[in-house]
Structure formats: C-alpha cells, structure tokens
C-alpha cells in the first residue's frame, strides 16, 4: 500500500530589540510616560518553498527589527515632521526628536497589539504568493505578549 502525504512547512524566527514608547490612555498610568522595553519578537511563517528553496528570507525579518532597535516608536497620529525633526504632541508633552531616532507607525497607539500588527504588515509587504500564514508575537517582558495571525489569500490574477 502506498501512502500519500502532505507536507506543511513553517519557519520560525526570534530576536530581541530595545525600543521606547509611550501610550495614549483614557486613565492614569505610568505607561503614559516615555519608557522602554527589551522586546522579543517571534515570527512563524507558513507556506510553500519559493524558487530559492525558502519560505521567506530571514534577512527581511532582521531588517524590520533593525529599523525598530534603539528608537522611539510613536503613532502617526501624534507627529508632525518638520525638516529633520519629528515633533510629537501627546499626553501634555511636546517633544522634538531627530527623525532618524523615531519610527512612526500608522496605528492609533503603540501597544504591543498594534506593534505586532505593524510587524506582520511589514512582513506581508515582502511576502510572495507562496506564503499562507504569518504569526507575530511581541513580548514586552517575560510575562506578557500580544499575538496576531495573518492568513494571506491570493487576490485575482
């Protein structure tokens, strides 16, 4: 008797990075102040092998982390860019920060949930048609993380 089998392929990647942020909250919290984390990102990508024999190039993941590492992460809704500066107005703060020290994300807040979503979207931008699922987990500390899963579906031809 011959057996038929189906291969399901995944890659897994993880890296730590250091970044600072603050949150916009309706209630009082120390997290409204600028603070930092040694984040850990975990990525799992499911798909088929591409022409090079890979599901996804790990280098693309490292580039996303490099963009975030040792930078202040802020919401697009809070900033105004003036020349080489980013002016951030939020929580009774006005900060002027050199543009190259800031990552502006197109999310309403800089929570672990939104950061995981942003990271997943960046991966999806580089994903080939061979990618089926992207899972991103962002750890803010050893006890807490946020996770998102993207299911990619081909759009028309």
UniProtKB/Swiss-Prot annotation:
InterPro entries linked to this entry: 6-PTP_synth/QueD, 6-PTP_synth/QueD_sf
Pathway: Purine metabolism; 7-cyano-7-deazaguanine biosynthesis
Active-site residues per Swiss-Prot or TrEMBL entry: 31, 70, 140
Keywords linked to the UniProt accession: Lyase, Metal-binding, Zinc
CC cofactor note: Binds 1 zinc ion per subunit.
Positions contributing to Zn(2+) binding: 21, 35, 37
Requisite cofactors: Zn(2+)
Top-level EC class as recorded in UniProt: lyase
E.C. number(s) listed in UniProt: 4.1.2.50
Biological role: Catalyzes the conversion of 7,8-dihydroneopterin triphosphate (H2NTP) to 6-carboxy-5,6,7,8-tetrahydropterin (CPH4) and acetaldehyde.
Miscellaneous note of the record: The active site is at the interface between 2 subunits. The proton acceptor Cys is on one subunit, and the charge relay system is on the other subunit.
Family, similarity comment: Belongs to the PTPS family. QueD subfamily.
UniProt name for this protein: Putative 6-carboxy-5,6,7,8-tetrahydropterin synthase
Organism, as annotated: Pyrococcus horikoshii (strain ATCC 700860 / DSM 12428 / JCM 9974 / NBRC 100139 / OT-3)
